[in-house]
């Protein structure tokens, strides 16, 4: 993954660099409590979606043990310790080789990338959009949305009055 890029996006969106919790509907920053390692080690996560990262090979044992006990979805370009423990694993195209985008160097310099050649596998964005669409369909099927449509319909189903 591109840790610096992920940190830059979180900082841009919230003002905090990492360790951000959105469970109350707004960002809260506490790196001793809300980092991925803390959340998993404390047993606070009820599911995990892991993208282009392999915590199964380098997180503390307590965090990995919790991952083994919750639903885990992984998107990665290769087989890893984390894809092996996942309930669902998607093999994806490699960004910067098969897909375009932007990565950030460790000194925060952005580098635009163009695809060098095609992949038989979908990119992360395609998979994430398909997952979002299916989750919305399941939410709407389960809940009455009171006549709303689109995103409002999903919001009404998820947050009933």
Language-model regions, residue ranges each:
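Non-catalytic alpha/beta scaffold blocks inside enzyme catalytic domains
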Residues: 1-161
């Amino acid at each position: 993954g591109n840790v610096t890029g992920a940190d830059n996006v979180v900082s841009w969106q919230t003002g905090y660099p990492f360790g951000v919790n959105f469970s109350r509907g707004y960002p809260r920053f506490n790196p001793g409590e809300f980092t991925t390692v803390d959340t998993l080690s404390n047993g606070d996560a009820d599911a995990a979606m892991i993208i282009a990262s392999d915590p199964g090979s380098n997180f503390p044992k307590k965090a990995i043990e919790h991952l083994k006990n919750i639903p885990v979805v992984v998107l990665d370009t290769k087989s890893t310790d984390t894809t092996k423990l996942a309930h669902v694993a998607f093999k994806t195209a490699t960004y910067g080789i098969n897909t375009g985008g932007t990565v950030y160097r460790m000194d925060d310099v952005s580098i635009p990338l163009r695809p060098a050649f095609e992949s038989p596998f979908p990119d992360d964005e395609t998979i994430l959009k398909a997952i979002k669409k299916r989750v919305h369909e399941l939410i709407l099927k389960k809940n009455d949305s009171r006549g709303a449509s689109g995103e409002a319909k999903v919001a009404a189903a998820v947050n009933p009055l």
